[in-house]
Structure formats: structure tokens, C-alpha cells
Amino acid sequence: MNKGYPTNLTDNQWQILEKILDPTRRKRINPLRDIVNAMLYLIKTGCQWRMIPKDFPPYNTVYYYFRKWKNEGVLEDMMDTLREKVRVSMGKEDTPSLGIMDSRSVKTSHHVDSDRGIDGNKKIKGRKQQAVVDTLGLPMALAIHEANIHDSVGAVSVVKVMIDRFPRLRKILADGGYQGETLANIVKKDLGCELSVVLRPNESSKKFSVIPKRWIVERSFSWLENFRRVAIDYEFFSESSLAMLQIAFSAIMLKKLL
């Protein structure tokens, strides 16, 4: 294992992930710790799979595990487990009672031709990332769709991810882009909680104003700017983009734990 990269897991961090990714601790030609380190290097630097340094396992082996964990939901489970651990470490219940919803549009690379559109407001051709976070800014659910889909429609995909997972959830805060009875009814039916749309004091004003608690999810999106692989969407398929977000948020939460 190469120990020279700042993105490499510490021993304590690996002890946490090992219980999630490798509970049997089976011997392998390429240790899973090295494979995870390669993924963390890739998402931080934004390099191509083939450009992963040679002192990591072969790039096709790393990609094999990325695809396997993506398809089997392992990366999502990892993100969820880390969120619960961070919450407990900060003296909170393992599941939140309040969620905060928002989205951001991200430009896709020129070679991406699927699951993308043009966000007319932001003038961005790419994909939209939907997120619901807790009051600590930790991700509860993520979804990705074409940037031209309105928030009130695209949010349904992230709501579906949350079904039967947050028994304490009572309210989700959102901005004016999520107005409408249709979405509110879906949230009530599927999650059993209230969707509270918080508007700025004057929606027609272009002056900046901080909306209580809404800044939390915006801060969560800003954390992702430290990871080049997700600052611009290079993935052919939105499922891979989602998996990259899950890895990035997992890396963020690992640092909060240790």
C-alpha cells in the first residue's frame, strides 16, 4: 500500500469502513483498503480511471469494485452508516427529525450525452443533483436527473429514496422551487411528514438574504467543491454520478469522525 497520498485512509478510518465493506476480512490479491484509497484519490483529483497511479491496484480492479458496490447499494449503505455514526458522536439521535432539501445544477463533460439537459435559470447544460440533508448538513438522500427538470418534479426521485428509512422524520424544509400540492402530497403520503416551503421575505427581490436553516444544505453542496470528480460531472450514466457523490460525502463524514 502506498502511504504517500493525503487521501489515503488512516488506520482508524479503515477500521470503521472495514466493518461495512469487508466484514469477513477475506484475504484478497488486492486489499480492499488499497482499492478504497484508489477511489478516494480519483474522486479528489478528478483523474481518469486509467490514470490512477500504478502503486494502487490495477484501475480495472478498482473500477470493478466501484461498479459492484454501486449496483449492490454498498456505497449508499456506507454513506448512511457514516451519517448515523457522525450524528451519534455529536450527541444526536441516529436518525433525524428534520430534513432540508435543495438542488444544484452541475455542468457535464462534453462527452456525456445521456441524462442531461439545460437549466434555463442557471444557464448550465448538465445534470441536477437533488439532496436532503439533516441539520448537520449530512446527506440523508441523494438523486440525480436532467438539469432541465423542475425541482418540484425532480424532488420526487429523492423522496422515493427516503421511504421507510427515517422513522423520526417530521418535516422537510425547502425553498420556493419546491412549491406545489403535488410534491407536498407525495411527501405526506410516502414519508408521513410535512413539506414546509420557506420563501425569502421578498421573492421578487434580487438582494441576498439568508433563509433560516436553508443555508445548511447549500454548505453541504459547497463541501463537494473540494472533490474535482464531482465539481464537473464526467460520468456517462447518472447512476455513476450518484455513486461518486456517495463516495465524496463518505470521505467528508470520515473526517468528521476522525
Question: What are these model-predicted stretches?
Answer:
Residues M1-L258:
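Short alpha-helical elements
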